[in-house]
Amino acid sequence: MIVTVFRSRLNPGAQDEYGPMAKHMSDLVRAIPGYISHKGFIADDGEKVTIVEFESEEALREWRVHPEHAKAKKRGIDSFFSEYKFQICSVVRHREWTARTGPGVSE
């Protein structure tokens, strides 16, 4: 599994235009073969953090070179972001645990 962590800060006044574009990118990435999931958060200090999971580096590459995503990245640099950084990580170990809610509950 490949995890990307995208951290950014928007320029003042950019949210109104950025929001619809970000929503469109969110819809597009779901169609990439090998896409697993993504979630976004806004920290108390205003930093936006998006975590995206892909099955492979090839799936990530497909997203990276997607024509609409490429245009959105350029627009982000030119208009929306005061700063950004991203990290691409290979998952070394993965564990999950879910508490059972009680007897008689099916999973």
Model-identified regions with their sequence ranges:
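Short acidic (Asp/Glu) patches
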Residues: 72
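Short S/T/G/P-rich N-terminal loop/turn motif that feeds into the first structured element of a domain
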Residues: 1-48, 55-65, 81-107
